[in-house]
Amino acid sequence: MTNDPGSTQRGRSRGATQSARPVAARPPKRPSPQWRRMDLHLHTPGSNDYQEPYISYLDILRQASARGLDIIAITDHNTVAGYAAMQKEVEQLLWLESRGRIDPLEQRQLDEYRRVLDKLLVLPGFEFTATFGFHILGIFPPETPVSYLEHLLLTLRVPPALLREGSSTVGATSDVLTAYHVINEAGGLVIAAHVNSGNGVMMRGLDFGGQTRVAYTQDPNVHALEVTDLEKRGNQTTRRFFDGSKPEYPRPMRCIQGSDAHRLIRESATSPYLGVGDRVTEVLLDEVSFEALAGVIRGNDHSLTRPYRGTAKAVDFVQLAREEGESLVQAFHPTMNQRGGHLDNILRDICAMANTNGGTIYIGVPADAKAKPEGVREPARAIEALRTTLAKRFSPEPPVQIDSLPTQGTTVV
């Protein structure tokens, strides 16, 4: 919770000879390709199975930036509602700024969006559930209108009533091959999601004919396969299976990995539920753009993608603050319960910071950096209760921005 107080041209020819012989201009030097990090399978609170519905869209972008990602795709279940909500939030802040009606807290939020989006390419998309429950990622250029993507989902027979629900179960929709074709024809990247696990088109554990599996993984309209074992080695990996060495699977398939994140940060090292940037693919690009990415994903040079094996960990901003310790601009409270005077202590700190240089108050975590934080149960409800209390107890109400942050598997305010 943050408290905020009040004409010389370059490139001339070296000269012409007396016979006016033209001098050929040198073509501009192309930038050297660089390895870029991408996570093309991220969910948001726009998916109804998202595990932390109180997380903001800005939180997700911040985490992606903190993990060193260059490209992400928002791929909620059978909807683009999450991406649309993020887009609408940014547009609203820009509108307020353009009319001089933006308050300091909103300005800080907009500035943070600008900072993150200046470094991060965010692509719209969806995770479509085809017939028999198979999952397919469709990823599109950033300028693609939300209405176009919603029309595409309707074309794929997602029921209109469920178009903004973010549900992974939407009844009888289009089959896998039709979905591949429709998404590809619409200009999207077509990636079969987590093919070697649940809802994957490898159909493990399902009694389907071999020709169906071949068609679902070799169709010319599918550009890549997302796998969960890309970093494993040996002869039994999914990438080895689809390397073109099998007569029945002659087309070598590009295999990439994505986090399929349904939460901001992985709860523990053994949890199967990954966070943003926990499974990353590196891609060699001349520039960070959808066009450059599409050129690689649709191409045949499989050496241009590889699993990212870096050791970068998610930044725990709360723990960093605890290690710095309490100060005039930083305070910690293990709980906001009224009993024991905890809420009153929080209000005193708010009042003090509002009348000085501002600061940040962390609720749900003790100041001792070695103590395990308890966190705040139902953060969204706690934030609303705190807003109500501030409105009742202060006049004028101090400018306070209240957010939730993850730390050590729990959430603080």
Label each PLM-derived region with a short phrase:
Residues V288-V413:
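Conserved N-terminal catalytic/coupling substructures associated with nucleotide/phosphate chemistry
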